[in-house]
Structures are given as C-alpha cells and as structure tokens.
C-alpha cells in the first residue's frame, strides 16, 4: 500500500476524498436539515441534460452540466418560493426534463461519447491537479461563506419562517446555498458518479444525527465518516483490484 502512494494519480485521489468529505459534510447537513434531499437527485439528473448538450455541441461537458445544474436548482427554488408550485413537484419536473434532454442529445451526438461512463459511475482516479485546484477553491469559498453566515444558515435550514421574522433574508440564503449545492453536485459527479452521489450527501448525515444534534457537530462527524469511508474504499479497491 505504501508503494501506491508514490503515484500521482493516487495522491490526487486522496486529495479529492478530503475535499469531497469537506464539501459534502456542509452541503449534506444543510439539505438534510432542510429536508430537501430530493433536490440532490433532481440536480444530479438535470445535470445529465447539460452533459448531453455539451457532448452534442462539442464543448466541455462539465461546464455545460454546471450551467444546467445551477439554472435547474435556482429554478426549483424560484418556482417553489415565488409561485404556487410544491417543491417536490418542481424537482420532479427538473429531474425528468434533464434526463430527457440528456438522452436525446447523447443519442444525436455522432460517434462515441468518451467519458460518459465516468459521469454515470464515477472514477476518482481520473482527477487531475487542475480539478483539485478548482475543487479546493470551491471548498474554500463554501467554508468562508459558512463560517461568515453560520447562524443565518442554521436558522434558515431548521426554521425559515422563524428566521424570516428575525429579519434574516431567507430567500437570499436559500439561493446562495442552492448555488453551492448545484456546484458541489457537478464537481463531485465525475468522481463518484450519479449513483453514489446522493448517498454521500445523505447517509453520513443520517448516521451523525444518531449521535449529534447540533448542526456544527453533525458537519464534523459526517465529514469524518465520509473521509474514513472514502480512504477505506480506495484502499480496498487497491487490495482487491476492483474499480475505485
């Protein structure tokens, strides 16, 4: 196991696990507290539409997926808050529309679509130094905003109505956090895949809630769980010679 640490791709994977653990701990705790876990699946599948458009137009699929994810997430937030549309209904529309657009454009793309399997099932060993720097910049921005607006985020997540009566701009907080959720989904999806992403953003928080009740403690414990499971899974993939 020590020998594999000398390889750059394995070092990159370890850095990726650390960054994923940090971002998913904050994002996951927020969406679980708001009881909006379903939106993660909606954004994930909406970004699939962006992938299809990106492959069809010959542009960076990650960039097009990011645009789709952010617009879809903000659209869900706007529809559910500003209009008489239930949040779960808006998410279902985004979910179905994103998948439909993705399938159509991928089918229309001539030739083979390289890298599509990575987005569906993930491959953390393919992350590059550039990806790590981008992810690290996003994680730093997320941590900075969370520390700066910690109480505001907690009040909004657990009781938005009470927070509104206290003069907190809950809609602005929701929009900003929704932006972070969408960006985190797109940055993580190529590393762990659509299938595993929802689990990373929910299961550690559910386990942490069994032992903690404060938002801050749930973030720390869920991050530690993600980190240990990620390193453990990567180690097992090496020992058993199976996909990471």
Where are these regions (language model features)?
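Membrane-interfacial amphipathic/re-entrant helices at transmembrane-helix boundaries
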Residues: 1-22
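Transmembrane helix-bundle core of multi-pass membrane transporters
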Residues: 7-12, 83, 91-151
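Generic alpha-helical transmembrane segments of integral inner-membrane proteins
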Residues: 18, 22-26, 67-75, 101, ...
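Hydrophobic alpha-helical transmembrane segments
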Residues: 14-19, 62-67, 92-93, 132-137, ...
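Hydrophobic alpha-helical transmembrane segments in multi-pass integral membrane proteins
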Residues: 106-113, 182-188, 231-242
């Amino acid at each position: 196991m020590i020998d594999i640490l000398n390889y750059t791709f394995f070092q990159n994977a370890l850095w990726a696990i650390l960054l994923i653990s940090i971002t998913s701990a904050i994002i996951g705790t927020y969406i679980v507290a708001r009881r909006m876990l379903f939106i993660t699946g909606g954004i994930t599948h909406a970004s699939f539409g962006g992938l299809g458009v990106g492959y069809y137009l010959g542009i960076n699929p990650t960039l097009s997926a990011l645009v789709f994810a952010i617009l879809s997430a903000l659209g869900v937030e706007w529809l559910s808050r500003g209009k008489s549309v239930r949040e779960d209904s808006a998410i279902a529309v985004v979910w179905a529309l994103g998948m439909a657009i993705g399938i159509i454009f991928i089918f229309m793309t001539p030739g083979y679509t390289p890298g599509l399997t990575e987005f569906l099932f993930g491959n953390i060993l393919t992350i590059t130094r550039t990806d790590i720097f981008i992810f690290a910049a996003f994680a730093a921005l997320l941590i900075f905003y969370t520390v700066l607006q910690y109480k505001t985020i907690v009040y909004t997540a657990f009781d938005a109505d009470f927070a509104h009566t206290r003069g907190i701009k809950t809609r602005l907080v929701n929009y900003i956090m929704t932006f972070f959720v969408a960006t985190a989904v797109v940055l993580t999806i190529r590393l762990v895949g659509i299938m595993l992403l929802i689990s990373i953003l929910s299961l550690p928080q559910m386990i942490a809630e069994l032992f903690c009740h404060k938002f801050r403690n749930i973030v720390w414990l869920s991050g530690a769980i993600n980190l240990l499971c990620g390193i453990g899974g990567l180690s097992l993939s090496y020992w058993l010679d199976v996909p990471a």
